[in-house]
Amino acid sequence: MDIGDAAGNPMVRNALGDSFPASPEVTLRLCREAGIDEYSHVLHLGAGVGTVCQLLIEKFGCKATGVVLVEPLLQHCTYEDERVQYLHSKMTDLPFDQGIFTHVLIECRCVTQPDLEAVFLTAKTMLEPGGKLIVNEPIILSKSSLPRILGRMIGDTRLNEVVHQRTAMEIGIEIANAEFEILHSQSEPEVTQRLLNKMNQVSMLMKMALRFSSFDPYSEAFPFTKKELLKAFDEFKSALDDETFGWHSWLAAPN
């Protein structure tokens, strides 16, 4: 099962829910606070399989355009309304005219971007006058470090090319460097708790499936044992519980 198949699987989507790993309630609250209404056109950078775009048009009656970063996910995007569309593109090379969106939404995608300032500068060009940037991201606590096995997995594999963990202050600085004024910023413990609850729900099933499956991490060029994978899963849960990992949101407008 590749990433597209997993994301499009009804059982996976039912278990994880819309806007995973974020919270749909928090996403809707942030969008409401940003002034999204039936006249808005939202650009969602990193749209996954489109559940958030669908959520927005159903709740606010707006238009939504989702940029999908992983091309195989396009076939699983949720098309249920003519007000929503999706396309595959990089976050820093968007095929749109400038200044045509009222809002740009980024959730849990900054962590995958090595040049975050470039992402925010691109987002700025997409916004019409008076437009708003909404960012909702996982963060690592200042002066904290990754758990032992999880840190090894990221440091010793290609994960270090795609995971760029930042503190809330570091993301805020990148937003400001792109010449945005930060209108509001706050921690989002509801997202962290929801993610922890989801992981607890699937923990036993995942552990049983991994233990009894024929999957061999080494055969996938991933130099860790099943036991270490399970330990990393538990480390991640503990890091959420003790707030080593958290969630933070920003609302910003171009200067």
Give residue spans per PLM region.
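A short glycine-rich, Lys/Arg-flanked "PGG" loop and its adjoining helix->strand segment in the class I
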Residues: 117-132
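Conserved Class I S-adenosyl-L-methionine
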Residues: 184-255
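Conserved SAM-binding loop and adjacent beta-strand
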Residues: 12-28
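Class I SAM-dependent methyltransferase SAM/SAH-binding core
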Residues: 49-93
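Short alpha-helix
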Residues: 163-179
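A short acidic, Gly/Pro-enriched loop at the edge of an enzyme's catalytic core
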Residues: 92-104
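A short SAM/SAH-binding and catalytic strip from SAM-dependent methyltransferases
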Residues: 103-116
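Conserved class I S-adenosyl-L-methionine
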Residues: 134-156
